[in-house]
A protein has these predicted regions:
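C-terminal segment of classical bacterial N-terminal signal peptides
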Residues: 14-23
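Bacterial N-terminal signal peptides that target proteins for export
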Residues: 1-9
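Short flexible loop/turn segments that cap and initiate beta-strands
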Residues: 59, 63, 72-100, 130
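Short beta-strand elements
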Residues: 140-165
């Protein structure tokens, strides 16, 4: 009987402790917090050979990187252009590139934020850091950065894009 009473007290204390932790986690999420999903794929440019819309992290000067970003609210709902005022990708050099929320596929099968950036002919080789900045309708901002691993980062490599034959 004594063991049961002690077990019941311990269980009650544990349950109250876990409830407090869960409540603290809920309170720690400020309004406007987002979850990000994203990738980069090779974007089709005229006369280039492709393949396109494939996941790659190494690009040659003159090739185009397509940034694809999905944003979710804490409740799991999509954060579209009605929930977010603007979404930009800021490259490591400070250049900001705006994304648009639009359908993708023909016919459209998905909606997400996207844009493409053609790597300039004079861009230095090496990895390019970037981050995504979402500005909410209330003016607050939320940032996301991809993994910080040089081998998987967006990278400019030497060479010319392969052209159609």
């Amino acid at each position: 009987m004594k063991k049961i009473a002690v077990s019941a007290i311990a269980l009650t204390i544990a349950a109250v402790g876990f409830a407090s932790v869960a409540q603290a986690q809920q309170l720690a999420q400020p309004a406007g917090k987002l979850f990000f999903e994203g990738d980069i794929v090779r974007h089709a440019l005229p006369n280039q050979a492709g393949p396109f819309c494939v996941l790659v992290n190494q690009y040659k000067r003159g090739e185009a990187v397509a940034f694809r970003i999905r944003t979710l609210l804490p409740n799991g709902q999509i954060a579209d252009d009605k929930a977010i005022k603007s979404l930009v990708v800021e490259l490591g050099n400070g250049q900001r590139l705006p994304a648009g929320y639009k359908p993708h596929g023909a016919p459209p099968t998905d909606f997400f934020w996207s844009f493409f950036w053609t790597i300039p002919a004079d861009h230095p080789t090496g990895s390019i850091g970037y981050k995504v900045i979402a500005t909410m309708n209330d003016g607050s901002t939320v940032e996301w950065k991809p993994f910080n691993r040089a081998t998987t980062a967006l990278m400019v490599v030497a060479g010319e894009p392969e052209m159609k034959k």
